[in-house]
A protein has these predicted regions:
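N-terminal beta-alpha lobe that positions the nucleotide/phosphoryl donor
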Residues: 1-177, 181
């Protein structure tokens, strides 16, 4: 008997599991992204120059990270190098990778997740959203659906962006696109 895996392909999982590669793919697909640096050059000088171009406050994030590990909020240039070294060290220890991305910080954001579903024929739909803004240490504590600040126009725009993101990686199965507002 054949066993059929239901879910995203190994290629989609690998791509979306790396924040730098995922962000480059989303930008290429025209999906709105927070401005930042997701390049392959990872030396301190390159990242410092990118930080100056992005401006402060900014976030340093482990490309292989999740759950808030390998993340540092930097409020000014004087604190960048120490935060960079700390984030890189945590990323290596937690994920075995020293690749980092930089993003303009969104202070006190709403964390909204859009549910999507894709089939094996390339059809992808968005199903709704939930507000996951109540967090502790970057871990969700409460999920509220529907999102209380959502308008029909914003829901449509976010849903269409989530579908575009999923199509960019040929996503199959149930998934979630995370959005900061």
């Amino acid at each position: 008997a054949d066993i059929i895996f239901i879910g995203p392909s190994p290629e989609a999982i690998e791509l979306m599991g790396d924040k730098a590669k995922a962000k480059r793919a989303m930008i290429k697909a025209g999906v709105p992204c927070i401005s930042g640096y997701q390049g392959e050059e990872q030396d301190n000088l390159t990242l410092s120059k990118a930080a100056s171009e992005i401006g402060y406050p900014l976030m340093i994030k482990a490309a292989a990270g999740g759950g808030g590990r390998g993340m540092r909020l930097v409020d000014k240039d004087d604190n960048f190098e120490a935060a960079l070294d700390s984030a890189r060290s945590e990323s290596i220890n937690a994920f075995g990778s020293d690749t980092l991305i930089l993003e303009k910080a969104v202070l006190r954001p709403r964390h909204v997740e859009i549910q999507i579903f894709g089939d094996s024929h390339g059809n992808i739909i968005y199903l709704g959203e939930r507000d996951c803004s109540v967090q502790r240490r970057h871990q969700k504590v409460i999920e509220e659906a529907p999102c209380p600040i959502m308008t029909p126009e914003l829901r449509k725009a976010m849903g269409e962006s989530a579908v575009a993101a999923a199509k960019a990686v040929n996503y199959e199965g149930a998934g979630t696109a995370e959005v900061l507002l």
